Amino acid sequence: AFRFGLTNERGYGNTYRVLKNITGLWLLQGLKVHLPENTSFADMEEMTREGGKLMHVIDPDDPLFYNPEDMKEAFDSYFRKTGQKLPGVFSEYLLCAYESLCFSFRYHIEKLEQFTGRNIEVLHLVGGGSQSDYLCRRIASVCGRKVVAGPVEGATLGNILIQGLAMGRIRNIAEGRGLIRQACPLRTYQPVDAPDMTRYRAFLEMKKT
């Protein structure tokens, strides 16, 4: 567990779950500041679709991306460090960010499978990222697994559930989860496109350095 960088998180009823902290949409938030102020994440996804063929890849867990003053410059520094040409248009940065995040998710899922000896067949995506239809589809295809997206406010709903249990308004966790499913319809995504295995192998080589 130490070698894989895993930890444990305590939950309700003396339960524990294996936890791995990795970089997420922070990359896209950092790139967003280089776009007009009224640009939405939906606009960024549309730009990503215009990015053409994937030509760049990064390791989102590299220290360069932890808290840079300029995320685009952090990308450029990483490209220079790894011998990649700089993107010619901004949409290539976005495409690189989205696809590299999906590669990172796949990598860490495979590591979790090695560590636990269990196959992970379904990915549950909660929080703000679950609102992105594009991201959910890409995660499903790159990771080769079904993705269940939602709810968006997972932490808040979990807090409400536990308070309901403490107040006797909810009988047990199963009932609370059922109420959440009724209140927050989930979306399901299946793998559609094959991942770019050439770029994924390049990503794996980066993880070795």
Task: Name what the model sees in each region.
Residues 1-122, 131-155, 161-197, 201-208:
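Active-site core segments that coordinate phosphate-bearing ligands/cofactors
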